[in-house]
Swiss-Prot record:
Induction, as annotated: Produced in the A cells of the islets of Langerhans in response to a drop in blood sugar concentration.
Gene3D superfamilies (UniProt xref): 6.10.250.590
Pfam families per UniProt: Hormone_2
Family: Belongs to the glucagon family.
Domain of life: Eukaryota
Protein name, entry field: Glucagon-2
One CC-aspect GO term: extracellular region
Keywords, ordered alphabetically: Hormone, Secreted
SMART domains: GLUCA
Naturally occurring in which organism (per UniProt): Oreochromis niloticus
Compartment(s) where it occurs, according to its Swiss-Prot or TrEMBL record: Secreted
Length: 33
């Protein structure tokens, strides 16, 4: 179960990081353009 929990947490963290990265791209690039 520990392995499953760890992989669930890392997929969650990767998902959050991806969403933050996408919104950073939208806001950051939008301001520059």
């Amino acid at each position: 179960h520990a392995g499953t929990y760890t992989s669930d947490v890392s997929s969650y963290l990767q998902d959050q990081a991806a969403k933050e990265f996408v919104s950073w791209l939208k806001t950051g690039r939008g301001r520059r353009d």
